[in-house]
Structure formats: structure tokens, C-alpha cells
Curated annotation (Swiss-Prot):
Binds 2 Zn(2+) ions per subunit. HAMAP family: Glyoxalase_2 (MF_01374). Thiolesterase that catalyzes the hydrolysis of S-D-lactoyl-glutathione to form glutathione and D-lactic acid. Gene3D superfamilies: Ribonuclease Z/Hydroxyacylglutathione hydrolase-like. Its EC number is 3.1.2.6. Its cofactor is Zn(2+). This is Hydroxyacylglutathione hydrolase. Zn(2+) 2 binds at residues 57-58, 127, 165. It catalyses: an S-(2-hydroxyacyl)glutathione + H2O = a 2-hydroxy carboxylate + glutathione + H(+). Keywords: Hydrolase, Metal-binding, Zinc. GO terms for molecular function: hydroxyacylglutathione hydrolase activity; metal ion binding. Coiled coil: none annotated. The gene is gloB. It comes from the Bacteria.
Length: 251
């Protein structure tokens, strides 16, 4: 299996998995044009689309792709049923694509119906988990997003986190504002800064590394707790997550 990233809009990535035969899976195609260009250039045969949630920058290209390739099966949560989904999937179910089983994981927070897809080592997490950050809470609660991130953080160490946006640099600037002396965060920030200066992608990331540099996955970390306690005493990791998310929203 080959993993490919297709840039779209200002900072989106549309992920494509293809096998040796050229069959491919497309994840969150917000725009059809760059996907069609890649299909032509690589002689891919699209088999399926995975949708993580209903926002336009993730579903906007579905109609055109299905018109061009009517054999495509479109998997998605209930909230994407009017966006072209032909196979609604929910937490605990599996999608069998390209000879692989993808587990569906419910991750409410960014939207109420948001889902992720996992088939080792690939995690397609839409707008739930970003490198160094997490999605904004447009529909769900901080508690829901905290629980969703806990699910994803519990996946195997070698999981490849395939996020849908290039937000890594801004996320790491925020992380440095919270933990300015953290060695892992500083090292990763320098690496990301160099990549973005060359207009290179920072994704996917390995989950084991992500746990070290993403403050939203470190709500039980003593260094982070001490920083938060300087401003307010919060006993529960969910409360600390909500504090971080609110802080990031104003960053």
C-alpha cells in the first residue's frame, strides 16, 4: 500500500491509499480537481471514498468524483448522508477496502458525528487530531473531544496519523507558549519550521512521537499540570483539556 497526500485549498490534505494494482481509496476529498489530476497522472482506479465529517472542505468533491467514477462506494457517518455517502458507518463497524479492514472510531468533538478510520498503521483522523493540536469544538463539547483523543492516543505506537490540515507550525507555536522549556517540543518545532520554510508537508506523524509533543495528549503530564496550576487549580484531565482548548482558541 502506498500513502499519498494531495494538497487542496489553503491547508487541506486529501489522503489517497493505493495498492500495487492501482486501486485507490480517497479520504475527505473537499475538492475534486486535484484528485482527478492525481488519478490521471498515476493511472489509479478509485474504489472508495472515506468521509470523516460533513464540513464542505472535506466533502465538496464527492459529487464530481462519483459522477466520473460511479462504481465508487462512499463511506461516511450519518451526518454525511446528504453529502454523497452511500454506506453509512458508525463506531465499532468496519469498512473492507483494498483488501484491508478499516475500523470505524466515533470521535465527536469537532462535529457531533465525526468518525475516524484505522487500519494498521494508517489512521485517517480528519479534524479530530492534528500534529501538535486538535480540532476546534464547533458542535461537540470539550469532554467529548477529550474522550475522542484518548481513544486515538491508545492506538499502537507506530500508527501513522494522517491529519486533514497543515496546522503543525501554528500548533507548535502554541505548544511552546505553554511549555517553552520542553525539549521534545522545541526539537519538533525546529524541525517543523524547517520543513514549512521549504513548503514541505509535516505529515503523517508517528503516534508515539505525537504523544510527546502534543499538549492536548499530555493532560496528565506533571509539567503541564504545574503550568496550569499557576493560573487555576484543575483536578481532572478533562478540565485541563478544556483549559488548553480555550487557550488555543484565543491564541
Amino acid at each position: 500500500m502506498n500513502l499519498n497526500s494531495i494538497p487542496a485549498f489553503d491547508d487541506n490534505y486529501i489522503w489517497v491509499l493505493n495498492d500495487e494494482a492501482g486501486r485507490c481509496l480517497i479520504v475527505d476529498p473537499g475538492d475534486a480537481e486535484p484528485v482527478l489530476n492525481a488519478i490521471t497522472a498515476n493511472n489509479w482506479q478509485p474504489e472508495a471514498i472515506f468521509l470523516t465529517h460533513h464540513h464542505h472542505d472535506h466533502v465538496g468533491g464527492v459529487k464530481e468524483l462519483v459522477e466520473k467514477f460511479p462504481q465508487i462506494v462512499v463511506y461516511g457517518p450519518q451526518e454525511t448522508q446528504d453529502k454523497g455517502t452511500t454506506q453509512v458507518v458508525k463506531d465499532g463497524e468496519t469498512a473492507f477496502v483494498l483488501g484491508h479492514e478499516f475500523s470505524v472510531i466515533a470521535t465527536p468533538g469537532h462535529t457531533l458525528g465525526h468518525i475516524c478510520y484505522f487500519s494498521k498503521p494508517y489512521l485517517f483522523c480528519g479534524d479530530t487530531l492534528f500534529s501538535g493540536g486538535c480540532g476546534r469544538l464547533f458542535e461537540g463539547t470539550a469532554s467529548q473531544m477529550y474522550q475522542s483523543l484518548k481513544k486515538l492516543s491508545a492506538l499502537p505506537d507506530d500508527t501513522l496519523v494522517c491529519c486533514a490540515h497543515e496546522y503543525t507550525l501554528s500548533n507548535m507555536k502554541f505548544a511552546l507558549s505553554i511549555l517553552p522549556h520542553d525539549l521534545s517540543i522545541n526539537d519538533y518545532y525546529r524541525k517543523v519550521k524547517e520543513l514549512r520554510a521549504k513548503n514541505q508537508i509535516t505529515l503523517p506523524v508517528i503516534l508515539k512521537n505525537e504523544r510527546q509533543i502534543n499538549v492536548f495528549l499530555r493532560t496528565e503530564d506533571i509539567d503541564l499540570i504545574n503550568v496550569i496550576n499557576e493560573e487555576t487549580l484543575l483536578q481532572q484531565p478533562e478540565e485541563r483539556f478544556a483549559w488548553l482548548r480555550s487557550k488555543k482558541d484565543r491564541f
